[in-house]
């Protein structure tokens, strides 16, 4: 018997179920499979009633008895438990989170705290598609995920990531009670939905109390707790923490409802949890009123929200409005203003970032700001601090920018103190360099603060991608004296690591292997890993294309001034590298300690792959892509750039072609029309590349 054959109405484990059973071993396999199928159906129904409908049918004790019986049957007869509710207790730890492509793009939403911006959004919508109704929803302050079902069964879950790709967190999400492993009712064959994973505020307080009692650090806020939990590699840890989810959008389905309101009804019918704080609005005034009422009620909710989302209800109108490259044009997030509280400044310290940037930070009397205890707040930069006039002893108004980052807004009462920004780095004593309003430590990688932060950054995805080397482990390696610079990572042995607290033979060997596997990065990834100021992934790709190999950079110990002059001049020819960025990159390479670290990496066998140009077949051509293509956006960019072309994010008079894939955004097409830029369907794009000897899609 399969679970699908079970008739819920005749299931004996739904109402007044037995709590005692004969030994599992006394059943035949056929009888055990039949009873297990009934129990799975019953446990799923009880989960739905308890977590989603808030209308339980049985007592906790009865539920526990049914659950235990199901576990006993599955264990005794080695039954298939792929999507059994018993899987929620968590499985074996995994080595790392893998990146997966989303079924459909998870685009962002334009946002503002200003009602006039919402009114402008409404005017544009009505101008383009006429009168519409809106659906108003809370803007949950959690972690957005895509959950995929096939034939009604849970298949996969992934974080939002960059909107196109995210981390596979299937093992973690399966443990969350409010995520059904099997859909209810007349569900579509294929379904991808979007939801927000969060930690209830009441459970967050209890979790933090337990962590403090156990000698562990408390989480800063429920969102951090949810995000940290979901990315934990051990599903049993996730299962032990109180995560929950609200679903609010259908990303892809074999049959899609014709409105958002209908989509929410379908989600409920399929057993997917939807908040009851959703309303319709006939005009923008009603949407503003909804937001004001939600702001007044936010403290009474058991989940964090930071605003409301206003969505065009009609799917037809949505399709006509289209999308931008990163956000939809049919929804708007009307956010709450940041919360403010007044407290006293007890000290001002200077924080040193991984690129050497010095940031003044106010140490405060602890104050509760929106449910989070704030004891530190950024002052941004020396000029901002001076403009605010903040000094020790002042009473200041503090807010959480975006309800996340604490910052000082103003001085409300002068405490009579004074403060001067240091002219030396507080960590290493090197001179402070000023660049406009910003201040930087000139010590480079010889500065311990920059060194430790740069080691952690060296290992991240997009740089050297060293699995298992997070911030805590980096701090442990530095504290133990095993690592002073990133080059020292390549001297580590399993014996060194196995002696450290919390390490075993397997984890030590895994890290050594991961470091060894990171000896042949692409040149742009290597440059990202060096923590060069102003150099992110896009700029690193440009530098890699321009210079071709690491040896083309001035990295020798005896590099002279004229070499750096020529280097800086060449930098300004790289797309999107202006004079300021060129100067910051020059400063990095002009620092002898930084060059020594690069040479030490090369001496230890790190060999960044030279950029081998695929030719100049696309030289001088600039493309913009909208919609979904057969190849990922990053693969298209890499292909075009390797053959001398350029891919940008927006259409202008300098664009040669707009490549249009599936579900394209309207704004780029409008911009292309306004600038007389030709558009290419994907097949036409493929033909154009083929004419120039470039194969597409890339292998």
UniProtKB/Swiss-Prot annotation:
Keywords: DNA damage, DNA repair, DNA replication, Ligase, Magnesium, Manganese, Metal-binding, NAD, Zinc. Zn(2+) binds at residues 425, 428, 441, 447. The keyword Metal-binding applies. Gene3D superfamilies: 5' to 3' exonuclease, C-terminal subdomain, BRCT domain, DNA ligase/mRNA capping enzyme, Helix hairpin bin, Nucleic acid-binding proteins. It is an enzyme of class 6 (ligase). Residues 1-29 are annotated as: Disordered. The active site is at residue 139. Displays maximal in vitro activity at high salt levels. Residues 613-666 form the BRCT domain. Disruption phenotype: Deletion of both ligA and ligN is lethal. GO terms for molecular function: DNA binding; DNA ligase (NAD+) activity; metal ion binding. Its EC number is 6.5.1.2. SMART domains: BRCT, HhH1, LIGANc. It comes from the Archaea. GO terms for cellular component: cytosol. One of its GO terms (biological process) is DNA replication. Its cofactor is Mg(2+); Mn(2+). DNA ligase that catalyzes the formation of phosphodiester linkages between 5'-phosphoryl and 3'-hydroxyl groups in double-stranded DNA using NAD as a coenzyme and as the energy source for the reaction. It is essential for DNA replication and repair of damaged DNA. PANTHER family: CHROMOSOME TRANSMISSION FIDELITY FACTOR 18, DNA LIGASE. This is DNA ligase. It comes from Haloferax volcanii (strain ATCC 29605 / DSM 3757 / JCM 8879 / NBRC 14742 / NCIMB 2012 / VKM B-1768 / DS2). The lineage of its organism: Archaea, Methanobacteriati, Methanobacteriota, Stenosarchaea group, Halobacteria.
